[in-house]
Amino acid sequence: MAHPILEKWSNAVNSHNLEEVFSLYHSEAVLVATFSPNPLTSKDLIKDYFENLFTNPRAGVIFDFDSMSTQDLADNLQIMSGLYTFLKEENGVEVKVPARFTYVIDNSQEQPIAHHHSSQLP
């Protein structure tokens, strides 16, 4: 079953809605991004990453919600891990990039994504 924050994130990524994606990340969030060699440790770096991602006309993501595991750490704190596939275009051809993810979500916060790690599957 999909988590509402991940559905919101997925919909925003797939519609290239930068402000919606950006609004989900906490002011002190860290993003270890699929297509970046370095951890993104500020909101400016996170915004730059998604701005760059959205220059690709086919950039998008498909969650495999059946693979998702949720750990409830506290009343409003969850860790969610699983698999998704990034879509992008290279040389006019759609490319699928299988990846794994971990999110730390604080549901008590207006900007609930505290940490997001994403990496290509080996």
PLM segments and residue spans:
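Active-site-proximal loop/hinge segments that shape catalytic or ion-binding/gating pockets
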Residues: 25
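Generic hydrophobic alpha-helical segments
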Residues: 8-9
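A beta-strand edge to alpha-helix "cap/lid" segment located at domain peripheries
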Residues: 1-5, 14-17, 30-33, 37-122
